[in-house]
């Protein structure tokens, strides 16, 4: 069994050694331009077209939760990956836990009004504020996949009203489910906090725009943990300036790194993190990949395969 590996920033040698230990029967090598030697599996992130083009692979593994970088390149270069080759993503290799930590900490930050107290502190102003009530602090999760499910589970502990929206209806205990564009307005109407965990597809690009934000209750909060392309940043800034949106926590952006001249940096109601909400944990990723390859070699059914038509 031959495995090729490519990631522009990961510690390649660590990965190769870890994969060799986890899959002793495999010959693992770092792919370099000009390497056309056959392989069975490819582990990639932002792969060059020539790495995958023409190969008879058993599977390709994207080294992250998203596959939009591969699918967008595949649209421009359909020869890059044969239709018969299954594409897998890291469905949850510690990312669910990280998303839970991030989402819960920020929801509680807003619920206890720490953002307001920080603004008061900046002007040396001492003033206790009225508390928010749980029953009025509905949290909506936009995108109901594996990570959305994990976030919902963690928030249930805090007894907030929860709802989710996705392409198809879900049956999550304690979570009100909305499905399809025809139910999006009803979903948004009660969301004091909107958590975005949508996949990046042509249908979801720019979905968080003026029209969507206007359907939220006044003074709502936005937590974007998915992709920057989901948010029309000028529309969000306008909603923040008007008070329609009271605060935004943003981990992802249309351009990354976020340019220094972006007005998001200086906005008093925006908090920024540099795309760190859920990063790939190498040891857990290697464990998932090795187990999945073992299942594929046995002809077993496995989870995490991407539907290329849907984009996730």
From Swiss-Prot:
<feature type="active site">
    <location>
        <position position="227"/>
    </location>
</feature>
<dbReference type="GO" id="GO:0005829">
    <property type="term" value="C:cytosol"/>
</dbReference>
<dbReference type="Pfam" id="PF02826">
    <property type="entry name" value="2-Hacid_dh_C"/>
</dbReference>
<dbReference type="GO" id="GO:0120509">
    <property type="term" value="F:hydroxypyruvate reductase (NADPH) activity"/>
</dbReference>
<dbReference type="InterPro" id="IPR023514">
    <property type="entry name" value="GhrA_Enterobacterales"/>
</dbReference>
<keyword id="KW-0560">Oxidoreductase</keyword>
<dbReference type="InterPro" id="IPR029753">
    <property type="entry name" value="D-isomer_DH_CS"/>
</dbReference>
<dbReference type="GO" id="GO:0008465">
    <property type="term" value="F:hydroxypyruvate reductase (NADH) activity"/>
</dbReference>
<keyword id="KW-0521">NADP</keyword>
<comment type="function">
    <text>Catalyzes the NADPH-dependent reduction of glyoxylate and hydroxypyruvate into glycolate and glycerate, respectively.</text>
</comment>
<keyword id="KW-0963">Cytoplasm</keyword>
<feature type="active site" description="Proton donor">
    <location>
        <position position="275"/>
    </location>
</feature>
<dbReference type="InterPro" id="IPR006140">
    <property type="entry name" value="D-isomer_DH_NAD-bd"/>
</dbReference>
<protein>
    <recommendedName>
        <fullName>Glyoxylate/hydroxypyruvate reductase A</fullName>
        <ecNumber>1.1.1.79</ecNumber>
        <ecNumber>1.1.1.81</ecNumber>
    </recommendedName>
</protein>
<comment type="similarity">
    <text>Belongs to the D-isomer specific 2-hydroxyacid dehydrogenase family. GhrA subfamily.</text>
</comment>
<dbReference type="InterPro" id="IPR036291">
    <property type="entry name" value="NAD(P)-bd_dom_sf"/>
</dbReference>
<dbReference type="GO" id="GO:0030267">
    <property type="term" value="F:glyoxylate reductase (NADPH) activity"/>
</dbReference>
<dbReference type="GO" id="GO:0051287">
    <property type="term" value="F:NAD binding"/>
</dbReference>
<keyword id="KW-0520">NAD</keyword>
């Amino acid at each position: 069994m031959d495995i090729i590996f490519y990631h522009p920033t990961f510690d390649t040698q660590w990965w190769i050694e870890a994969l060799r230990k986890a899959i002793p029967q495999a010959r693992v090598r770092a792919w370099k331009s000009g390497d056309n030697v056959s392989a069975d599996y490819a582990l990639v992130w932002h792969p060059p077209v020539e790495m995958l083009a023409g190969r008879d692979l058993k599977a390709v593994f994207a080294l992250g939760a998203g596959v939009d970088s591969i699918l967008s390149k595949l649209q421009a270069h359909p020869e890059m990956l044969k239709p018969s080759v299954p594409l897998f993503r890291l469905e949850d290799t510690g990312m669910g836990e990280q998303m839970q930590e991030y989402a819960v900490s920020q929801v509680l930050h807003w619920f206890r009004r720490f953002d307001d107290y920080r603004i008061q502190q900046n002007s040396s102003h001492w003033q206790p504020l009225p508390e928010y009530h749980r029953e009025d602090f509905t949290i909506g999760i936009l995108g109901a996949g594996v990570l959305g499910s994990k976030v919902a589970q963690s928030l249930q502990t805090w007894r907030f009203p929860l709802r989710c929206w996705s392409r198809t209806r879900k049956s999550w205990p304690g979570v009100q489910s909305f499905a399809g564009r025809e139910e999006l307005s009803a979903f948004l109407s009660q969301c004091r906090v909107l958590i975005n965990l949508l996949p990046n597809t042509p249908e979801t690009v720019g979905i968080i725009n003026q029209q969507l934000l206007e359907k939220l209750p006044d003074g709502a909060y936005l937590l974007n943990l998915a992709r920057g392309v989901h948010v029309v940043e000028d529309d969000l800034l306008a909603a923040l300036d008007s008070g329609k949106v009271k605060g935004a926590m943003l981990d992802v952006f249309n351009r990354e790194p976020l340019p220094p001249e972006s007005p998001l940096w200086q906005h008093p109601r925006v908090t920024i993190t540099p795309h760190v909400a859920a990063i790939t944990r190498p040891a857990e990723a290697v464990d998932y990949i090795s187990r999945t390859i073992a299942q594929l070699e046995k002809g077993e059914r496995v989870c995490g395969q991407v539907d290329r038509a849907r984009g996730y």
